[in-house]
Amino acid sequence: VHKPKRIILNTFGSFGDIHPYMAIAMELQRRGHVPVVATMEIYREKIEGAGLEFVAVRPNIPQPKEQDPELIEKIMEPKTGPRFLTEGLIFPAVRDSYADLLKAVAGADLLVTHPAAPAGPLVGRKTGTPWISTVLAPFSFISAYDPPVPPYWQWTRRLSVLGPGVVGFLLGMMKSSHKAKVVTEFRDELGLDDNGNPMFEGQHSPTRVLALFSEVFAKPQPDWPPQTEVAGFCFYDGHHETEVPPELSRFLEKGAPPVVFTLGSSAVWVARDFFRESIEAARRVGRRAVLLIGDERNMPSSLPEGVIALDYVPYLSLLPEACVVVHHGGVGTTSQGLFAGVPTLIVPFAFDQSDNAEHARKLGTSRTLYRKDYFAPRVANELTELLRQPSYARRAIEVSQKLKREDGPARAADLIEQILTRTRNSPEELAYASGD
């Protein structure tokens, strides 16, 4: 790719949705391009602090600590949360999102879109801007060959015995019950063809789909879009944002590897008794503990000897020091847990978390305990199994070694540059009807 290209990366969500795009943007910037991260206003300071260009795209959802706790509870509810998030917050803002993104892509060479930001494909198709779509987790593909495991239907992991034909039919029924009426009406107003449900097949670019996870985690399936390329996990850890606190360094040096308990950046706001039960579970198995509590509101009333609580620590620094990591199963934390090379206990809350837990379980590195069952005796039993059976630690190291041979941001940047080169050589190949 000869001259620097302006590349808009549009994303939406929690840190697990922001960090991979920041990692790719930093790699593109290192190669001389001009990447722009287009997302919610609350991330401006974070993104600009990393030396990246930022553009605000609505909806402007406030920081979790400033939100009504009831709203976060609704979003994180296992069965109804995804529908509430999409139909209550994302879809109604699609016109605002479109207007903001339309300004951002003026003069851009490429648009990169996110599965939960439906304005992105509309902007790409309407303007003729070449665009690449992404998925962060295998759940987004809704594959009949690797059936998704939603948090409220754990039995679906056994569906594969029915064969892809039957599973595909059942998944089709499920997808047809999820409408994106507001988005499809706006798409029709823009004069764009029906390219499928914006939540499912309509999110995928016909040019290229980047899977931002490793083939170690989920192998490509026959019903993934044929234009899919697997880039690998794209790690960003923000060392420049948060130093490892000296008290944590001292804690780690003076004893055996602890159990690390974390709920990422979203589930931590609906932690309830998670950290209290975690302290008791660690006591029962005779292990020290590090609690990443996210906010003072989760600080336990008292911390026993051998337990330290901190708001947040970069995972790349902390997780490899653990004997076990207990987390919620967000794809960002799941990937960091696998990269760290230690066994994990995954406690899914909502969204794709139970499916990520199932993929980790199949790797032999992890066990799963659902949120409703998270009580100290059960947690202690799971921790005992992970610590007692050497296969978990052995497999965790094997998987980690494989992931360390990959470079997701570099591979993603290579695949983006391929499309940019193709655009330069034959622009008509990537031009989409504007509908004008």
What are these regions (language model features)?
Residues 3, 216-324:
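Donor-nucleotide binding loops and adjacent catalytic segments primarily
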Residues 69-120, 161-205:
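Conserved nucleotide-sugar donor-binding subdomain of glycosyltransferases
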Residues 110-113, 311-359:
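A donor-sugar binding/catalytic signature common to diverse glycosyltransferases
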Residues 2-55:
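N-terminal subdomain of nucleotide-sugar transferases
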Residues 92-161, 216-217:
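Conserved nucleotide-sugar donor-interacting segment of glycosyltransferase catalytic cores
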Residues 376-436:
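C-terminal amphipathic helix plus adjacent low-complexity
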Residues 38-82, 155-156, 161-163:
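Conserved nucleotide-sugar phosphate-binding/catalytic loop shared by glycosyltransferases and other
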